[in-house]
């Protein structure tokens, strides 16, 4: 009979394809993988956790499969078994049994899945296809926005594109994340301790700050930490942050990245030349240099050009997604980053949250912490302080003085305030001395470190004066 003839693919295809039909593309999916996941769960309820940490209902391509998985989740949460009978009855109660194909389709799912042995691999396939479909959806959304910008600039559209794509990555937890057995954590911890034991580091396990007393307090700037440097105007917060960058660049080979939202790159470079050459920055700004000054600057330039590991981005009004994409590019090109510095946090923007400053700052702070973790690099972000501290007798900052402080204080691993008494008291006994007040340190002590401030060189140096109370 004709029905028994083998299927011929060429015979099934029309000789001339309809151009409109040919232009239609079916989103990536795997019906077989979805069926195997659902069937496997009916065979072995114990595999639910393996599947649930990989996929959610929306990852399934067909609506019936989404409904079935949702109902399975409801049964699991109520402590009921998931099998052909309980699932069919539950779907019946929700009025969805017929829409998913009836009892017959559920029976087919169960019958056609021989075992749940490979269910994790099938779930990974479902998840992978779902991510690609999300990317296609976002790409279409970006294209629509390009055709109909509604008054948005190209920069706004780029920010939209980056944020939508990054949101896919952020919403998809890595399958390597999640709870780990203490044995695995201990193995990794002991391996790290052994590594530190075998490598001489003088107590500095992170990025060397260049300041002995600060290193003793912090053990260096730790990878994945968000570090906030805050001060009132004229205290030298940009100078201090730049000195951290310079010291990191000189003491290691990894690139350091500066996002200067307030100051152009030429001014940043002039400060660095003054600091590293120990030449009066006023002379550099005015060009009134003698032969000795030129010799010092030439020597510094030679070192900087030899290392070539400082990158400066002086774009204004950057968004977290722009900072993230540019930092990622540098990290990708150089196999990592040693340090990221942002001057300063409140000059960043999140267009979608511009109507609510508190939420905007919270998103910026959260994003910078996420960047530090993603690239495993210390991120130093400068921050403003509230004017209210000017009304106090003791004007040394505390954590609550951070402007829009709630989210910043919560996200930060290390908070350092700069205080110079001579700014407020002309006849202070502490002229030329800066206090670095550690207001918060998630994994270390708080306290105060003294540094010598050489303003003419735009530089903080190690303190060599009498002993002081560092509590």
From Swiss-Prot:
One of its GO terms (cellular component) is primosome complex. Disulfide bonds: none annotated. GO terms for biological process: DNA replication; DNA replication initiation; DNA replication, synthesis of primer; replication fork processing; response to ionizing radiation. Hexameric enzyme depends on Mg(2+); in its absence, DnaB is trimeric. It comes from the Bacteria. Residues 200-467 form the SF4 helicase domain. 5'-3' DNA helicase activity is stimulated 2-fold by single-stranded binding protein (SSB) and 6-fold by SSB and DnaG primase. Homohexamer ring. The helix loader is a DnaB(6):DnaC(6) complex with a cracked opening large enough to allow ssDNA into the central cavity. Component of the replication restart primosome, which is composed of PriA, PriB, PriC, DnaB and DnaT; DnaC is required to load the helicase on the replication fork DNA while DnaG primase associates transiently with this complex. Interacts with PriC alone and in the DnaB-DnaC complex, probably 1:1 binding with PriC. This is Replicative DNA helicase DnaB. It comes from Escherichia coli (strain K12). The lineage of its organism: Bacteria, Pseudomonadati, Pseudomonadota, Gammaproteobacteria, Enterobacterales.
């Amino acid at each position: 009979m004709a029905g028994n003839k083998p299927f011929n693919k060429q015979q099934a295809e029309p000789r001339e394809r309809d151009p409109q039909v040919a232009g239609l593309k079916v989103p990536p999916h795997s019906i077989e993988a979805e069926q195997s996941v659902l069937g496997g769960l009916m065979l072995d309820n114990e595999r639910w956790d393996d599947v649930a940490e990989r996929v959610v209902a929306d990852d399934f391509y067909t609506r019936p499969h989404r409904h079935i998985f949702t109902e399975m989740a409801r049964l699991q949460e109520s402590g009921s078994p998931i099998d052909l009978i309980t699932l069919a009855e539950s779907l019946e109660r929700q009025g969805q049994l017929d829409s998913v194909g009836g009892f017959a389709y559920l029976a087919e799912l169960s019958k056609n899945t021989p075992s749940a042995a490979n269910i994790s691999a099938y779930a990974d396939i479902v998840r992978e296809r779902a991510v690609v479909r999300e990317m296609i959806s976002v790409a279409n959304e970006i294209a629509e926005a390009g055709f109909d910008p509604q008054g948005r600039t190209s920069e706004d559209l780029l920010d939209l594109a980056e944020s939508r794509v990054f949101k896919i990555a952020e919403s998809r937890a890595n399958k390597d994340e999640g709870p780990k057995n203490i044995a695995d954590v201990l193995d990794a911890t002991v391996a790290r301790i052994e590594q530190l034991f075998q490598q001489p580091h003088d107590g500095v396990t992170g990025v060397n700050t260049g300041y002995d007393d600060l290193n003793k307090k912090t053990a260096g700037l730790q990878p994945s930490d968000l570090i906030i440097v805050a001060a009132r105007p004229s205290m030298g917060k940009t100078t201090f942050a730049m000195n951290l960058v310079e010291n990191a660049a000189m003491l290691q080979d990894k690139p350091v990245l500066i996002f200067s939202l307030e100051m152009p790159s030429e001014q940043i470079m002039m400060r660095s030349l003054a600091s590293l050459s120990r030449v009066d920055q006023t002379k550099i700004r005015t060009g009134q240099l003698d032969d000795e000054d030129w010799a010092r600057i030439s020597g510094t330039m030679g070192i900087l050009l030899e290392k070539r590991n400082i990158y400066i981005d002086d774009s204004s009004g950057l968004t977290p997604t722009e900072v993230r994409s540019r930092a990622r590019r540098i990290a990708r090109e150089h196999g990592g980053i040693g340090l990221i510095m942002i001057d300063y946090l409140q000059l960043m923007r999140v267009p979608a949250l511009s109507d609510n400053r508190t939420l905007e700052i919270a998103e910026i702070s959260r994003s910078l912490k996420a960047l530090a973790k993603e690239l495993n690099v210390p991120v130093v972000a400068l921050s403003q302080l509230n004017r209210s501290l000017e009304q106090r007798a003791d004007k040394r900052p505390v954590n609550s003085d951070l402007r829009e402080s709630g989210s910043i204080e919560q996200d930060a691993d290390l908070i350092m305030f700069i205080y110079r008494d001579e700014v407020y008291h002309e006849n202070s006994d502490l002229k030329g001395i800066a206090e670095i007040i550690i207001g918060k340190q998630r994994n270390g002590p708080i306290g105060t470190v003294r540094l010598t401030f050489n303003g003419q060189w735009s530089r903080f140096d190690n303190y060599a004066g009498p002993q002081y109370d560092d509590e």
